[in-house]
């Protein structure tokens, strides 16, 4: 079945408002986690043209492993507490980093990444990974991104 994404213009909030029901439609009736993660990353990349967007999933109690993503080649494994992703996982909270060069222990998978937001991904109350979104511009992410990306992640917790 072919799926078309309606790309919207307008403010960041308007774009998320338009995208949210489309992502919900993509996920409805599909139980395969990899397929759903892949469609979420593709939709976010298509709508916002983020430099990199993808998931890391818990592989062992101390390591995340790369999952579906859109963008340049990425780091394959990230230890708990390392970099933005590992820290967000360890702390189980969203991290917004306006300038990745100023984040202690930042893992530079790409020198072109300038700012980042990482959100925990939950399944039935347990953290199973993180959503990582990178921009090639400084200060790209804010509370609007956090609000809507959190809503998108809640759609995956079914």
Curated annotation (Swiss-Prot):
GO terms for molecular function: L-methionine-(R)-S-oxide reductase activity. One of its GO terms (cellular component) is cytosol. Pfam families: GAF_2. Residues 32-158 form the GAF domain. Belongs to the free Met sulfoxide reductase family. This is GAF domain-containing protein A. It comes from Dictyostelium discoideum. The gene is gafA.
